[in-house]
Amino acid sequence: MNLEELKKRQEKIRNFSIIAHIDHGKSTLADRILEKTETVSSREMQAQLLDSMELERERGITIKLNAIELNYTAKDGETYIFHLIDTPGHVDFTYEVSRSLAACEGAILVVDAAQGIEAQTLANVYLALDNDLEIMPIINKIDLPAADPERVRTEIEDVIGLDASEAVLASAKAGIGIEEILEQIVEKVPAPTGDVTAPLKALIFDSVYDAYRGVILQVRVMDGVVKPGDKIQLMSNSKTFDVAEVGIFTPKAVGRDFLATGDVGYIAASIKTVQDTRVGDTVTLATNPAAEPLHGYKQMNPMVFAGLYPIESNKYNDLREALEKLQLNDASLQFEPETSQALGFGFRCGFLGLLHMDVIQERLEREFNIDLIMTAPSVIYKVNLTDGESMDVSNPSEFPDPTKIATIEEPYVKAQIMVPQEFVGAVMELAQRKRGDFVTMDYIDDNRVNVIYQIPLAEIVFDFFDKLKSSTRGYASFDYELSEYRPSKLVKMDILLNGDKVDALSFIVHKDFAYERGKLIVDKLKKIIPRQQFEVPIQAAIGHKIVARTDIKALRKNVLAKCYGGDVSRKRKLLEKQKAGKKRMKSIGSVEVPQEAFLSVLSMDEE
């Protein structure tokens, strides 16, 4: 194509994404748009078409991003090129959302007509506003009996401050309002503004590993043109690759002769590892590089850590291969080998958050058939030592000797909890119990309140979300972002079985809660660990100080069963003999710890 045609084509491009809270109908709306523009034949259509991972469908969440090109002939007779970039809506994947939004000029904000605005809707809207996107509100699910579109319209205007007078009332499920949405995209979403003649700049917003072609980059071209045969360079690490193929997705990959400014598509350049291609990085040409990269790229750091161990120790290498394969598609997953006396060989893994951790664990078990034991999740603590050094510790077993520690700082998050008014008391009580500090509270409408707390991340990692849902009958929605590190009175608690430390059961706890936490755990373990032939003491210790103890009584055989009557000294001899045997057993015996014991430590609470 010559320059004129390229510029004309650029004016017809519309890049947009759909943002919504979980379950407000985002994937269904995407399905309808694909049907309406006849991108996918009705034979190939299946629900949640863009959620290609089995797990995404099952949980009804979007994890990986997908970008699709559609052609739409508008009422003005012109054919427009739409690029729909699907985003995950969950708090763990916020960075993924922000990158996919950076690849767009507009965003469709889907709000449920019955539920109204939720915490994650807000979080994602602010990301879209940060990226200067044109936001089009849509009120979805208007066919529900509980729908109240007018209330939601005023809510959008009051809480977010968007003009919702032209918000389309739609039902993605019933296919109502889809055409108006498409027309609004043409009118409201601006065309891409880049310069075709400038040096190439393309934003990587995702990367997928393909066994035959290596890493395939999903990119949005901001300036310039890229075609097969070009030599590209990644700006964060200056590595260069030769482009083998470029193309677009119509969910299937379709090769093209070039990608020009405004296009969203893929580049295959036989790149070996996803580690080279960080999401948010800028691709440019090695021969004529851009002067500076696109802004907004940041290295994603894991917030939550846990040990993963295969239940069968001979599966260790399989687990490593499985983690490496997952890492190919998920650069935010980090892992390194670690060993535990209790669990053998395994890996210490870092995750973006709890959902991310859950999803990875489930994919390992499901796609790679590896049964796992997972240790208690922990966060990164900053430990300041008495000699002036400081260190980051994410694994309780690596904590230095308590006498060498001056202070420990732990990460706090700013948690936004949206909840109906009647549950505010329950939410505040929960947040206080989790050592939260109240920040502020705003009324969204007559009934809903946005409560903001500063809560230690370590408290959220355990079971905050489940507790929040159960104390508010499922009505609360929750979003968090890391705010700062603060000094806290933290101690490391060890669990001893039969006098031996079980390293996998160690955890970090606040000093004020140490006693009750220790007592709870030893009582819980007492119920779970099967009785042995000898008595087993279970102790919770901080340093050398035992704070809680309970004993599992020994199983004993009735050695007197065959003495009918008879001399008492005969009975005593048999009992003494049994006692000596138990004693010897105790000194050499080891205790089997069942898997539930590790899990029970995770679900610690005042049950």
Swiss-Prot record:
Keyword GTP-binding applies: yes
CDD domains given in the database record: EF4_II, EF4_III, LepA, lepA_C
InterPro entries the UniProt entry points to: EF-4, EFG_III/V, EFG_V-like, EFTu-like_2, G_TR_CS, LepA_C_sf, LepA_CTD, LepA_IV
Sequence positions that bind GTP: D23, H24, G25, K26, S27, T28, N140, K141, I142, D143
Alphabetically ordered keywords of this record: Cell membrane, GTP-binding, Hydrolase, Membrane, Nucleotide-binding, Protein biosynthesis
Record's keyword annotation contains Cell membrane: yes
Localization of this protein: Cell membrane
Molecular functions (GO terms): GTP binding; GTPase activity; ribosome binding; translation elongation factor activity
Gene Ontology biological process: positive regulation of translation
Record function comment: Required for accurate and efficient protein synthesis under certain stress conditions. May act as a fidelity factor of the translation reaction, by catalyzing a one-codon backward translocation of tRNAs on improperly translocated ribosomes. Back-translocation proceeds from a post-translocation (POST) complex to a pre-translocation (PRE) complex, thus giving elongation factor G a second chance to translocate the tRNAs correctly. Binds to ribosomes in a GTP-dependent manner.
Family: Belongs to the TRAFAC class translation factor GTPase superfamily. Classic translation factor GTPase family. LepA subfamily.
Protein name (database record): Elongation factor 4
Native species: Streptococcus pneumoniae serotype 4 (strain ATCC BAA-334 / TIGR4)
Taxonomy of the source species: Bacteria, Bacillati, Bacillota, Bacilli, Lactobacillales
